[in-house]
Amino acid sequence: MAEVERKEEQAKIESGSNEQKERGLDGVNKGDAVGDGKEGGEAKKVQQSPFLTNAVPRKDEGKGGEERDNIDAAEVVEKQRKHLEENQSDEILFKARCKLYYFSEETKALEERAEGTMIIEMHSKSNLAKITMFRDQIGRLGCNHFINPRFKAQPHGKVSNGWMWMSTEDTVETDALRKKIQLFVVKFYSEEDFKRFGEEYDLGRAHNEKALKTKTNKK
């Protein structure tokens, strides 16, 4: 019975999120995303994004122009462990229990990633607001990225106490490295946590937009 309820809940999430992902991808394809773009059929060089969350390589170029995944699972786990140690001084703006979903490029559907604790924090080194989700028990991250000013968080119409948003630089899972843009859905267990997340996300988004403009003007 629990399995049936889980599948029904996931089906609701998928039906309400595909349209949002398509709109976001359309925006990226028009060239307004943070990251790589193309012009005249040739790739153009861009500066490294300020939203990179770790040093895990995205892909290696193989012979004949083919790309191969260059991902070491043990390295990913070690980098996430170091993240927990190195960011203990960050200011916690929001913290609550949740269930996190992500859009899988393999199944073309939303998949449950984990239950755990969602945190919005002010990163002390960059002075940028970021989102981090810690999974229960296994001590790994469910997501880890700075809030991109381009992407608003929107209530998920078919999931109670649910928000959805996108990121261009989350790389905590190997699946995330296969696609530039990531769609996340989070479900909170209380209306209060749902409201507070939306408020803190908006504040963090506005803060990051201002901070990034200031950094750009100083160059």
Curated annotation (Swiss-Prot):
Query: Which compartments is it annotated to reside in?
Result: Cytoplasm; Nucleus
Keywords in UniProt for this one?
A: Cytoplasm, GTPase activation, Nucleus, Protein transport, Transport
- Where is it found, in Gene Ontology cellular component terms? cytoplasm; nuclear pore
Primary gene name: YRB1
For the RanBD1 domain, which residue ranges apply?
Answer: 70-210
The record's section on SUPFAM superfamilies has: PH domain-like (SSF50729)
Which protein family is named in the record?
Answer: Belongs to the RANBP1 family.
Q: Predominant location of this chain?
A: cytoplasm
Q: Point to the regions of Basic and acidic residues compositional bias.
A: 1-12, 33-45, 57-72
GO MF, any single term: GTPase activator activity
Give the PROSITE patterns listed for this entry: RANBD1
UniProt-listed GO biological process terms:
intracellular transport; protein transport
Q: Which InterPro entries match?
A: PH-like_dom_sf, Ran_bind_dom, RanBP1-like
Q: What is this protein called?
A: Ran-specific GTPase-activating protein 1
